[in-house]
């Protein structure tokens, strides 16, 4: 089994990324090997935590492999629109959600179209995308339009106005900073079966301490090699945007995982990454303050001092 490279000096020893590498090593060497939904198999531990200080623009962007932060940012901005269709992502060359609607299309139609050809049809045919590009009421739908129902008479109910949890959190951070209810929840039990994938990063909570905004994200299921680098970035970016919108300084990001795992077919990536040492510290500049948290654009974000080591890839388990 691989062992994590050891920090060469006291400065390296304090680098936040050693937490990530140690978690990866622990899963790969000591995790429980188990069957999973995808059929690929995982090594898994239950219950993990990482902490990261967002002060001075610092961001949890891995240096031991290249993380495509613009892709992760575009996904977060897409969540905030409430969209559940992959077409806006496809048109930005964001590929991370393509496999799920493609698998559904092949399963339901029997047409064994190649993934690239399916994605090209999503991009070029709006009607096709409307029918086959939707993921069900995932993430953003729950975040900004959580469904409500109201009595319509005769024991029937009709759809009521949706709840914008993100807007509510912005308001509560400004009006009642000491509240323990600054929460964005994605786990809508009534709609899980209609989602392409139930939310993995399911719960976000925010906490004001002095003039700093802390963020916590709980992830019920975490692919540490491919998913977690994106999830850390997304949670940190959301915390940074909320801090700017509500007038606080960025505080600490706390990540908590439930079933935290590595897929058995990710061995080459794991071995390669565990042989590397973290270095440097990427920082995020937000170049303007939009009117609302829903008005950020990818051009508003600038990363400086990011010098990652080479990209590492592995197959996505669907």
Question: Where are the regions a protein language model picked out?
Answer:
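Terminal, non-catalytic protein-protein interaction segments that mediate quaternary/complex assembly
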Residues: 2-318
């Amino acid at each position: 089994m691989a062992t994590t490279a050891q920090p060469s000096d006291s400065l390296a020893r304090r680098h936040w990324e050693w937490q990530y590498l140690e978690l990866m090593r622990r899963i790969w060497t000591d995790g429980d090997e188990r069957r999973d939904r995808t059929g690929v198999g995982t090594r898994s531990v239950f219950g993990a935590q990482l902490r990261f200080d967002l002060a001075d623009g610092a961001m949890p962007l891995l240096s031991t492999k290249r993380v495509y932060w613009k892709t992760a940012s575009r996904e977060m901005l897409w969540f905030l629109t409430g969209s559940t269709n992959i077409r806006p992502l496809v048109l930005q060359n964001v590929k991370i959600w393509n496999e799920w609607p493609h698998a559904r299309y092949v399963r339901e139609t029997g047409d064994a179209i190649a993934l690239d050809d399916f994605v090209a049809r999503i991009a070029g045919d709006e009607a096709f995308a409307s029918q086959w590009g939707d993921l069900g009421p995932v993430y953003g739908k729950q975040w900004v339009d959580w469904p409500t129902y109201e009595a319509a008479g005769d024991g029937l109910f009709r759809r009521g106005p949706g709840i914008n949890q993100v807007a509510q959190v912005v308001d509560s951070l400004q009006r009642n900073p000491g509240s323990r209810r600054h929460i964005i929840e994605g786990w809508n039990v009534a709609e899980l079966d209609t989602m392409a994938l139930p939310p993995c990063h399911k719960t976000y909570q925010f906490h004001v301490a002095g003039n700093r905004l802390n963020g916590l994200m709980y992830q019920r299921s975490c692919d540490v090699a491919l998913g977690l680098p994106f999830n850390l970035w997304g949670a940190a970016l959301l915390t940074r945007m909320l801090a700017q919108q509500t007038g606080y300084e960025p505080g600490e990001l706390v990540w908590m995982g439930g079933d935290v795992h590595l897929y058995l077919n990710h061995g080459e990536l794991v071995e390669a990454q565990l042989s590397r040492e973290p270095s440097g510290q990427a920082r995020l500049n937000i170049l303007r303050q939009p009117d609302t948290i829903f008005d950020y654009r990818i051009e508003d974000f600038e990363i400086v001092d990011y010098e990652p080591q080479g990209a590492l890839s592995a197959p996505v388990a669907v």
